[in-house]
Amino acid sequence: MELNNIEIQKIIPHRYPFLLVDKMVEVELGKRGVGIKNVTANEPFFQGHFPGNPIMPGVLMTEALAQVAALICMGLEENKGKLGVFTGIDKCKFRRQVVPGDVLRLEIEMTALRRGIGKAEGKAYVGEELACSASLTFALINPNTDK
C-alpha cells in the first residue's frame, strides 16, 4: 500500500511545518513501512541551522522516523484517533549530513506493538548511505483523556 500526503494527514495530526513525511511508498500496517521526505532549501529549520551551511537537525530525522512509525500503527482500525507520543529513543546514531536537495528514505520495522506501547527500529537513508538509525519507543494515547 502507498499513501500520498493528503492520505497521511488523515491518519496523523502533524501539519506544516512539522509534517516531515511527504509520502509513504510501502505500508504494512502494524509491521513495517517506508516513507519519503524531500528535503528542500525552503524548510523553515534551515533559516537558523545553519545560515550559509544548511543541515537538517538530527532530532528532526528521528521525528520523521517516528512519524512513519505512527502512520504504520495509527492506520490500524483499533488505533484510529489516537496520538503517538515518544517515550524513548535509544542507540541513535547520525552518520551523514542531510542537506537541501536530498531525498530522505525513512524505513521503520516494528518490533513490538502491545497494549498501546510500540517499539520500532528506524533507519534513514540518502540514496544508499545511512544517515540516521535509532530504536524508538512510543505510546499510543487517547488525546482527550490520557495526559
Swiss-Prot record:
It comes from the Bacteria. The keyword Cytoplasm applies. It catalyses: a (3R)-hydroxyacyl-[ACP] = a (2E)-enoyl-[ACP] + H2O. Keywords: Cytoplasm, Lipid A biosynthesis, Lipid biosynthesis, Lipid metabolism, Lyase. Its EC number is 4.2.1.59. The active site is at H49. The keyword Lipid biosynthesis applies. Its main location: cytoplasm. It is found in: Cytoplasm. GO terms for molecular function: (3R)-hydroxyacyl-[acyl-carrier-protein] dehydratase activity. GO terms for cellular component: cytoplasm; membrane. One of its GO terms (biological process) is fatty acid biosynthetic process. Involved in unsaturated fatty acids biosynthesis. Catalyzes the dehydration of short chain beta-hydroxyacyl-ACPs and long chain saturated and unsaturated beta-hydroxyacyl-ACPs. Belongs to the thioester dehydratase family. FabZ subfamily. This is 3-hydroxyacyl-[acyl-carrier-protein] dehydratase FabZ. It comes from Alkaliphilus metalliredigens (strain QYMF). The gene is fabZ.
